């Protein structure tokens, strides 16, 4: 059936995490609307509250009164949220706290050495389970600034170092191989921190005065929007408009891929919200051409690769995603989860030299295997609905991690 709809979505998850953390130590009262309503962001709220942060829901607003944070009484449970675990490691260290971080079974398999190494170099005493959660961090002694070259492109690791650097005795410098999402840098600049960005080199100075509070309407999450966009693109004679969507250049690799395969997109009402470019974006359905994604684009579409792989399944040939090994360290081994689901749906897909290959074809009906991973679940529900108008899935509860309103939006689109 044809889709012709306009949707408004919950706020960007990455921005929501960062806004909560920085507002919790700002000098005054911050108000946030359209905060992401998923379980991951709730994990960050509960973690900050365990450290004494004042965070209250007031109607549609979340009100945060900045104050000095304190050591939590118990280990902090980050649930399924890698962003919470990695960013809080640096952020709470900047406040010279002693704390422990735990997580669910999935998060407890994800690599933490990538933050343990730089934070230890800065002066944190860290105990871990052989590089995995739980982590116990003692940052009560003075922290020193570091010069750190990132071994992998990771906004979480970069942000952990930059946030820790706020409480260091000297400046910290981070050098990236490829640009990753820069919400931490933008928000720090807008809240009064001294941070200098020169291409892929970022320097942050220790905070000499408190951060300025913010009033923020969080723009729509483009990673969440991607599922609905692809469903519309795969539906003949369809179009969808996403209102007030985040258009940060480090987050629109997904749109760039769509434009490369001649999917028509129209942007209107462009504006900035606290340094972040946003706008209303229209996407119009079209036949799908196969495509190739170069390695340097992968960091900017890492969360959208599952849904782009679904798009490729309907393509006219072989699609190649180069250097996607980082997918193996997400909420699931997403690389294998994508391949397994595509094969279940009758689409040939395989790994070759750390690249993902998808050969377009005609899907056959199957049950979606979620691997308890929200993005895998949503991506392959879209595939099933686009191909058959219905779906079966082994676990849909995991979708609440990032987008509790997913099914409501699907229902609106199809009504």
Task: Go through the PLM ranges and name each one.
Residues 1-415:
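Structural preference for solvent-exposed beta-strand-turn elements
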